[in-house]
Amino acid sequence: MQDFWSKAMDAVAEQVSVQVFEAWIRPLKAGGEVGDGQFQVYAANDFSADWVKKRYGGLLEEILSEQLGEPVTLLFAADPALEKPVASKTQTVTPVQSGGETGDQENFHSGLDPRYTFDSFVVGGCNQFVHAAAARVAEAPAAAYNPLFIHGGVGLGKTHVMQAIGNRVLEIDPDKRVLYISSENFMTQLINSLRFKRVFDFKENFRSVDVLLVDDIQFIAGKKATQEEFFHTFNALYEAKKQIVMTADSFPHEIEHLEERLRSRFGMGLVADMQPPDLETRVAILQKKAGSEGLRLADEVAFFLADAVQTNVRELEGALIRVSAYASLTGKPITMALVKESLKDIVRGQDRAVTVEQIQKTVANYYKVKVTDLCSNSRSRIYSHPRQIAMYLCKQLTQHSYPEIGHRFGGRDHTTVLYAVSQVDKKQGSTPALADELASLKSMLQK
């Protein structure tokens, strides 16, 4: 079991953040088999055991079932011997010193990526309003549009423009304390503060910043303790006239299981909508990206690429990287013929829009199982293999996010979907039979 457990840990580490892995997954200890495919897993205390079971138990069971070749059920329990006072490895923020001093700025980590600036952001009709609002906030934090709530689909540039605000604020005033953090990281730090009895430090850390940038705020919905703490953090910063910027995948009033008091606060400033880029903006994005990579892209090639990939900026840039790699590896110039060859699967995929329901039905028929089996909790390979294939195809052929796909497959966690997609992606290159299965299914779905 120890060998399998070690391999499982490596697999999980690829699917979760470093903070989550170090704080919650690595400390787990594998016990022995207690019969009927059930294995004991120990955490330091009941709280940790319950937390890991609820959020990552399914992912661990999925990975171990695949490695052992049979369904696995994990039984989580506490082992006080594992409890030790270790320091949290998640990002922390140094509190502002009393008396108006800013503290040691060298020890403060903003979490910002310096590549995300307003200069590197391509402005078009789809995002002009968001860009203008973000620039205004960066020039005068908390003077207008507080909070600024940016929402839109996956890969449209919300994170880019949010971090551009932070980088611009620091460019104007390097002594400002700016913090960019994902909502998942906020939740992890909160849980660690409760676990290690450092709640006061947690509160002081987050309430000492001048600008707080929170990405994917929708993920705190349904999490009572996290919503409670974020509510008080929001109020403290707002009353102190500090700037708050948030991103989400939908309007505040459309986020399910979000407390009304938070919903009203998220919408009391400016709510800005990030739309998918139009053709001209997609072309401009491609040309800017190509220029930064030292590539020369003919206009006809740029327009063809922009027309072939209409989903989001992330996939558009991914297509350009793929074309560039294909040209580099084959030693050929970037021509229309090369682009069509390197993106033939994407170009063919434009012919028909595919839904999650169609994918589930097609995969179920192909593997001679039921759609309900794909959404069930069974980890038998008879069902787990088709389920992973279906999840992979959903990510490849639809615009749904990992959490959305997980919800369609029996309410599974997004990490389970992420693992399924990565496993299929890895195996198809070395398993011709799997590659043939995927090609057949894609052909059926795109007819």
UniProtKB/Swiss-Prot annotation:
Q: Where in the cell is it found?
A: Cytoplasm
Say yes or no: keyword Nucleotide-binding present.
yes
Pfam families recorded for this chain? Bac_DnaA, Bac_DnaA_C, DnaA_N
**Where does the sequence pass through the membrane?**
none
Q: Return the CDD domains for the record.
A: AAA (cd00009), Bac_DnaA_C (cd06571)
* Region: Domain I, interacts with DnaA modulators, residue numbers: 1-70
Where is the segment annotated Disordered?
Answer: 87-109
Per its record, what are the GO molecular function terms? ATP binding; ATP hydrolysis activity; DNA replication origin binding; lipid binding
Name the major location.
cytoplasm
| InterPro entries, A to Z | AAA+_ATPase (IPR003593), Chromosome_initiator_DnaA (IPR001957), Chromosome_initiator_DnaA-like (IPR020591), Chromosome_initiator_DnaA_CS (IPR018312), DnaA_C (IPR013159), DnaA_dom (IPR013317), DnaA_N_dom (IPR024633), DnaA_N_sf (IPR038454)
Bias (Polar residues) occurs at 88-99
GO CC annotations on file = cytoplasm; plasma membrane
* Keyword flag Cytoplasm: yes
Which keywords describe this protein according to UniProt?
ATP-binding, Cytoplasm, DNA replication, DNA-binding, Lipid-binding, Nucleotide-binding
Give any single GO term for biological process: regulation of DNA replication
Note down the stretches annotated as region Domain II: 70-110
Source organism, top-level taxon:
Bacteria
Query: What's written under domain?
Result: Domain I is involved in oligomerization and binding regulators, domain II is flexibile and of varying length in different bacteria, domain III forms the AAA+ region, while domain IV binds dsDNA.
Q: What does this protein do?
A: Plays an essential role in the initiation and regulation of chromosomal replication. ATP-DnaA binds to the origin of replication (oriC) to initiate formation of the DNA replication initiation complex once per cell cycle. Binds the DnaA box (a 9 base pair repeat at the origin) and separates the double-stranded (ds)DNA. Forms a right-handed helical filament on oriC DNA; dsDNA binds to the exterior of the filament while single-stranded (ss)DNA is stabiized in the filament's interior.
Write out the similarity annotation: Belongs to the DnaA family.
Quaternary structure note: Oligomerizes as a right-handed, spiral filament on DNA at oriC.
Q: What is this protein called?
A: Chromosomal replication initiator protein DnaA
Organism for this UniProt entry? Magnetococcus marinus (strain ATCC BAA-1437 / JCM 17883 / MC-1)
Classification of source organism: Bacteria, Pseudomonadati, Pseudomonadota, Alphaproteobacteria, Magnetococcales
- The protein's gene is named dnaA
